[in-house]
């Protein structure tokens, strides 16, 4: 028997022979393998698919010249999807990179593209310094950049889509000495690549193993480097088995496509809660150390120092931010509430100092919050953001409602908040949107409406607290804008303050905003807002990891056992994971009941348990200097915010917002309780 067929028979004997579903034929697919001899430029060998006799689902992939590998493929039809099982066996010691393309048959110009947590539509909201169509209409990326190892292509003209995803145990990664060019891996990796390419005007799914990134690799914030191609060592006689799944279906629009893709990925990768030793009570008790140790009292404003800290020191500084990223006022309220619940006089007293100082010294001449003050430099940001102003009002309305519930009133604060809500009404545009940034005299700095949903929350809360219907009407107008410009167009962007691109927070805030309106309305109106919440929630969910990316030995996050499922990618520009969740888990729990969808509540539990893993405490500091200062920029792929790379944090972080986010995660149903009173 021919040696090639002997190896082939051994490798695929256990596979089941079934018919194909998608039109998977040699004319619609191509494959190649690149081989590298150390010290030499790799050579690529196109592979021809030769169907085996008497076996309609098995192929031998042969090069036109002799190569020291046997490459075979079996195609199986399982539940209407095509499983592609590739077997690569080494006849000699080799370094290889395998890649394959499958044509969708769609015109590339008619398509929108999707790589979960990283690529939405054409990424045209992103700057040219980040991956987008501004640079190229074809992109290949390593799988660990994505919240699920999948690429989808949606044809708007045909209302059809095709996806490819990989199945594996995903247990290994390996270090390399270089981040670009042809690189030989120092060991085994489980990370392949996926993406889309324009092949003569036709949209094509591309995938392979080990990883490759082209035409650029995104290695640092706003830094594209030359492409990279990794080569895996395969010893003579060893075999690698790789599995990809192709699927195609119909979807009325891009939003419905995202829903189908997320549900498929959720069912495929089936993320389960992460076991940790920390209860919710443990988390709050440990994080409360941040409230105590970060307090700064020597300036006109009293605040928790929670931004721009060094991870290896956590020394306090003089920078105070009302909203994101410091969340000074929300932290003060959380500390106050926790202090009353647990008889912590220190927390109650500290929070009172924060509130009193902001009431006295925390407002601009026009009456807005001094949202970002740097006492170290004696500067104050003259530009306001709708997001930070809204987050400040949100925190204070929680505070006022809590105090009122317990028999304590603060008339000066009430008047300040009513004045600010009235000022928001002046800022609102005719289409219901709010400008992203503006000056103290109400002149507009950035008219973009992507941050609009952040204002919906305090407007609904203001209506509930002050019984002023103008605030509810304003909130409903924001929802009309969200529906018309973001949700219906599947275009969620510009919510973060340190990036202006497609991001998780825009869809998360949109879902939370319409959730608030669902809680305060009735009948058909309530159902309409609930439907919008559900639609936006799928986009937010698509940013959260459904699998555990592997780390190499020596990368701290892997060495301490981090499981990435349940963590959220941030944005196209900021390709790291974090614990930004706030009330979103409560939104998911509510949606689960409203629509009888257990995936929502089940995944909320995955998020809740997974985000407990990096709790810093004595003996388990997780690379952070102080107990309770929860890490922020968690770098899980070949990217960094500026320092340290995969497996580590950036050297600067902002525990002010991470503690606030987790605190709301572990205080479920807060909005429902507030708005039901």
Where do the protein language model's features map onto the residues?
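Well-ordered alpha-helical scaffold segments within catalytic/enzyme domains
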Residues: 329-345, 391-409, 454-468, 509-525, ...
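Low-complexity, Ser/Thr/Pro/Gly-enriched N-terminal "stalk/linker" regions
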Residues: 22, 27-31, 36-46, 234, ...
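Active-site lining segments of carbohydrate-active enzymes
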Residues: 377-380, 398-469, 484, 534-544
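Extended, well-ordered alpha-helical scaffold segments
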Residues: 257-294, 343-361, 405-425, 467-484, ...
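Bacterial Sec-dependent N-terminal signal peptides
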Residues: 1-22
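Aromatic-lined, polymer-binding surfaces characteristic
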Residues: 385-389, 445-456, 486-489, 497-511
